[in-house]
Design a protein with these regions (language model features):
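Short amphipathic beta-strand/extended segments with alternating polar/hydrophobic composition
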Residues: 2-3, 55, 113, 125-126, ...
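Acidic/histidine-rich, surface-exposed loop or edge segments in extracytoplasmic proteins
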Residues: 59-71, 116-118, 179-184
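Feature activates predominantly on carbohydrate-active enzymes
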Residues: 77, 81, 85, 91-93, ...
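Extracellular/luminal ectodomains and secreted, surface-exposed scaffolds of diverse proteins
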Residues: 98, 110-115
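Residue-level marker for the onset of beta-strands and adjacent loop->beta junctions
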Residues: 10-12, 108-110, 119
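Aromatic, loop-rich ligand-recognition surfaces of beta-strand-rich domains
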Residues: 1-4, 8-56
Length: 276
C-alpha cells in the first residue's frame, strides 16, 4: 500500500500470486501525515504447500580463546603497530626516521618524550597510544603534517627535522574516551576493515585510549538469546538491522531493519577481533 487513503471497514486485500511463503513481514516505512500509523489486523489466507521447511544451519563463530587473536602482545608488537601507522599514513620509507622505546613513568602518568639519537627521532612513552601521540606531535609541529579523519596533508620534509633537547608531554587523565552509541550508527554502521583501521590510527595519534567499539555486539546478543532458549529465527527477528543498532542497544527498539544474514555474525566478529 502506497497511497494516503485509509483502508475501508472491510479491509484491503493483496494477492501473493500463488507464491510460497513461510514468513510474512509487514513494514511501516513512512507516514508523513502524522505520527500515528496504525495496523489493526492482518489475516493471511492460503493453503498448505506441502513444501518442507528448510532447516537453518547453525551459525559457527569460533570462541575468542580458540582463535588466532588470543595471543600475548609483546613490547615489540606494540612498537610494530606504531610503525604500521607510519607506513599506512605517511609511507614505509619514513619508518627509518624513528626509534621507539617503552618505559613506565615514575609518577604513573601517560607520557611521551621526543629527542634525537644517532641521527633519528627517538620517541619514548609508557604504552602504544603514548608513542603514537608523540609521533603525531612530531609530525604536526616539526614536519607540518596533518592527519585527520577526512583527509591528510602528508608532504614530508626532505630530511629529518632535528629536535633540540627533549620535548616532554604528559597527561593526568588516565581515560581519554571516544564515541557514543549514536556515533556508531550515524557514521560507522557499515564500516569495514579499512575505514576502521584509518579511524583507529587517528584515535591513537590523538591520544584516545578508550573507544566504544560495539562491532559484533550482535553476536553477543545471538549467543545470549540462544542460551535462553530462543530459536535461531527468533533471535534474528529480535536483533535490529545494522543502521539501527544504537537505538537497539539503548533499548529503544528491536528487530527494526533486520534480520541480518547469518554470515553477518561471523564477518562482524572477525572484524571486531581485527580491531582489538
Amino acid at each position: 500500500k502506497s497511497d494516503k487513503e485509509s483502508c475501508p471497514a472491510e479491509g484491503e486485500s493483496y494477492e501473493a500470486n500463488k507464491k510460497e511463503a513461510r514468513i510474512v513481514r509487514v513494514y511501516v516505512e513512512y507516514q508523513s501525515e502524522s505520527s500515528k500509523s496504525l495496523i489493526n489486523e492482518i489475516r493471511v489466507l492460503g493453503t498448505p504447500s506441502g513444501t518442507p521447511v528448510q532447516e537453518t544451519p547453525a551459525v559457527q563463530v569460533e570462541d575468542f580463546k580458540d582463535s588466532k587473536y588470543n595471543v600475548t602482545v609483546t613490547d615489540q608488537d606494540t612498537i610494530n603497530e606504531v610503525k604500521g601507522i607510519i607506513e599506512r599514513r605517511i609511507g614505509a620509507a619514513y619508518k627509518d626516521w624513528f626509534t621507539f622505546e617503552l618505559a613506565d613513568a615514575e609518577n604513573g602518568y601517560d607520557y611521551y618524550d621526543l629527542s634525537q639519537s644517532n641521527g633519528k627521532i627517538h620517541i619514548k612513552g609508557n604504552n602504544g597510544v603514548s608513542l603514537a601521540t608523540g609521533l603525531n606531535y612530531y609530525l604536526k609541529y616539526f614536519c607540518n603534517v596533518n592527519i585527520s579523519q577526512v583527509g591528510d596533508q602528508v608532504s614530508m620534509p626532505e630530511s629529518i627535522v632535528p629536535v633540540e633537547g627533549t620535548v616532554h608531554k604528559e597527561t593526568t587523565f588516565p581515560v581519554r574516551y571516544s564515541y557514543n552509541y549514536c556515533t556508531l550508527s550515524y557514521s560507522m554502521a557499515f564500516w569495514g576493515e579499512e575505514e576502521w583501521r584509518n579511524e583507529l590510527d587517528w584515535l591513537a595519534l590523538n591520544g584516545v585510549n578508550v573507544v566504544l567499539d560495539a562491532t559484533a555486539q550482535e553476536e553477543v546478543w545471538r549467543r545470549f538469546l540462544t542460551e535462553l532458549g530462543y530459536t535461531h529465527q527468533e533471535v534474528k527477528d529480535f536483533i535490529a538491522g545494522p543502521a539501527y543498532y544504537a537505538w537497539a542497544y539503548m533499548a529503544n527498539l528491536s528487530g527494526y531493519g533486520g534480520p541480518v544474514h547469518d554470515t553477518w555474525f561471523t564477518e562482524r566478529t572477525e572484524l571486531a577481533r581485527k580491531n582489538q
